[in-house]
């Protein structure tokens, strides 16, 4: 019998076994990596250097997932979490890690993905940009709602690896001005007796509570997300909220009737005040709706934008196309440096908001086009000099990548919150020698989590 077969049949290599191991690294999901019986074991809530006692909870032939039972010897990278439910809540993965070590680990994530998946061995990599704040940085929070067995309205985030809610009254990574709203609004919902949606029974109304703040203006927007209209006395309660909180600019009701995990529905109704909150970003004014996309860490996004502008070295004569534009967060600042800008966005509300933002800032050289990148990009009458890509986590669709190769814009700026899909797409764009990477810049948009933002500039290779 071979050695590997001996390990496979070892009484310890099975679900429920309790073993000791040492964490030697982190994967891109933020889990600790250890080894037992020459096989990889992934353990959440751990740090490189930890010596642990763990229970194997999911066992495969070559790897296992484990639950932390006891820290036998803590890593020097450990720190006390700022959140009292950090060990339960699934919102943050790295509350227990020293912030400087988080930064180093995120830089390594980028390197590992580009080397392992992309095959890039020589990278023009800049030092990772740290977030201006490691706590209190989030300008938006959307909480699932539930009701306890005693009737208490709960709001929070799901437990790690489950769909069970962890009730919270404050969250250290969100803007502190939202915490008071969270606590008081939960009480008001409870006092009103509004029904809470039950996912198992597919009954009830209120599903989520969404809070957004313009961190530079202080304006806030409150949105209730419900399966149905008809919350009793909603207008009265909305008026009370506006009177109680001077910085609260509006209350909205979003309708999401589908029995799925989608958070926002297609219909949003303004109940009181304005349906937007205003924010300052890159010396511009932005209006943000209940469900329009905007980077949740304004300070870090501004840092990355500044470095991107420097690296692109725009001369003023370019046509720039922003292929996943949102409300124009990056489109509008960059438009001031080019001849013409085109913003492609699939969300119609974001298109309208982007057009409004251009008008507010008197930026006349931007056109917002509604539709998917797959359908709109091939119809453009002029090939862009600069193409900006900031796709969802899944990356660019294959047809988008093929269209980029067909058009061959001179420069591509690709921004991603998912290094593995970024590396995959870069590998495709550079595979035939059409493009070369000239600049790689990571930025910490999401402190206390394992997520990292990365921007890459590609330049067309002549011939």
Curated annotation (Swiss-Prot):
Keywords for this protein: 4Fe-4S, Iron, Iron-sulfur, Metal-binding, Methyltransferase, S-adenosyl-L-methionine, Transferase
Residues annotated as transmembrane: none
Example GO biological process: rRNA base methylation
InterPro entries on file: MeTrfase_TrmA_AS, NA-bd_OB-fold, SAM-dependent_MTases_sf, TRAM_dom, U5_MeTrfase_fam
Domain TRAM, residue spans: 12-70
Sequence positions that bind S-adenosyl-L-methionine: 295, 324, 345, 390
Chain positions recorded as [4Fe-4S] cluster binding sites: 83, 89, 92, 171
CDD domains noted in UniProt: AdoMet_MTases
GO molecular function, one term: metal ion binding
Catalytic residues, chain numbering: 417 (nucleophile)
Source species, domain of life: Bacteria
EC number, as in UniProt: 2.1.1.-
Family: Belongs to the class I-like SAM-binding methyltransferase superfamily. RNA M5U methyltransferase family.
Protein name per its UniProtKB record: Uncharacterized RNA methyltransferase sll1967
Organism: Synechocystis sp. (strain ATCC 27184 / PCC 6803 / Kazusa)
């Amino acid at each position: 019998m071979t050695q590997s077969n001996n390990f496979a049949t070892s009484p310890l290599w099975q679900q429920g076994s309790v073993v000791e191991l040492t964490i030697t690294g982190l994967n891109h999901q933020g889990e600790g990596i250890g080894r037992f019986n020459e096989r990889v074991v992934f353990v959440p809530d751990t740090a490189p250097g930890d010596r642990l006692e763990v229970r194997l909870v999911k066992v495969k032939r070559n790897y296992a997932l484990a639950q932390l039972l006891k820290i036998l010897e803590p890593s020097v990278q450990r720190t006390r979490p700022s959140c009292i439910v950090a060990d339960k809540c699934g919102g943050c993965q790295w509350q227990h890690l020293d912030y400087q070590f988080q930064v180093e680990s995120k830089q390594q994530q980028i390197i590992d993905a580009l080397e392992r998946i992309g095959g890039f061995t020589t990278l023009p990599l800049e030092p990772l940009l740290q977030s201006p704040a490691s706590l209190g940085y989030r300008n938006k929070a959307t909480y699932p709602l539930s009701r306890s067995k005693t009737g208490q309205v709960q709001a929070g985030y799901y437990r790690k690896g489950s769909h069970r809610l962890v009730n919270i009254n404050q969250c250290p990574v969100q803007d502190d001005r939202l915490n008071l709203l969270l606590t008081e609004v939960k009480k008001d919902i409870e006092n009103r007796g509004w029904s809470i949606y039950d996912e198992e029974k597919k009954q009830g109304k209120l599903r989520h509570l969404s809070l957004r703040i313009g961190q530079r203006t202080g304006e806030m927007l409150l949105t209730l997300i419900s399966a149905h209209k008809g919350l009793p006395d909603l207008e009265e309660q909305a008026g009370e909220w506006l009177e109680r909180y001077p910085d609260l600019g509006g209350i909205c009701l979003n309708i999401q009737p589908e029995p799925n995990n989608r958070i926002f529905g297609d219909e949003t109704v303004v109940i009181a005040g304005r349906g937007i909150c205003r924010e300052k970003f890159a010396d511009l004014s932005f209006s943000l709706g209940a469900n329009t996309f905007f980077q949740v860490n304004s300070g870090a996004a501004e840092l990355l934008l500044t470095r991107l502008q420097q690296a692109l070295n725009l001369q003023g004569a370019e046509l720039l196309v922003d292929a996943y534009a949102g409300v124009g967060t990056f489109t509008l600042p960059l438009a001031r440096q080019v001849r013409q800008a085109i913003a492609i966005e699939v969300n119609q509300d974001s298109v309208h908001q982007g057009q409004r933002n251009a008008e507010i800032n008197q930026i006349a050289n931007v056109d917002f086009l509604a539709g998917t990148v797959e359908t709109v990009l091939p119809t453009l009458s002029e090939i862009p000099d600069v193409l900006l890509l900031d796709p969802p986590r899944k990356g660019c669709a294959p047809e988008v990548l093929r269209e980029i190769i067909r058009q061959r814009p001179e420069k591509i700026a690709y921004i991603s919150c998912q290094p593995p899909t970024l590396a995959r797409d870069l590998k495709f764009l550079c595979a035939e020698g059409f493009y070369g990477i000239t600049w790689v810049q990571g930025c910490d948009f999401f402190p206390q989590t394992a997520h990292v933002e990365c921007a890459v500039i590609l330049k067309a290779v002549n011939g």
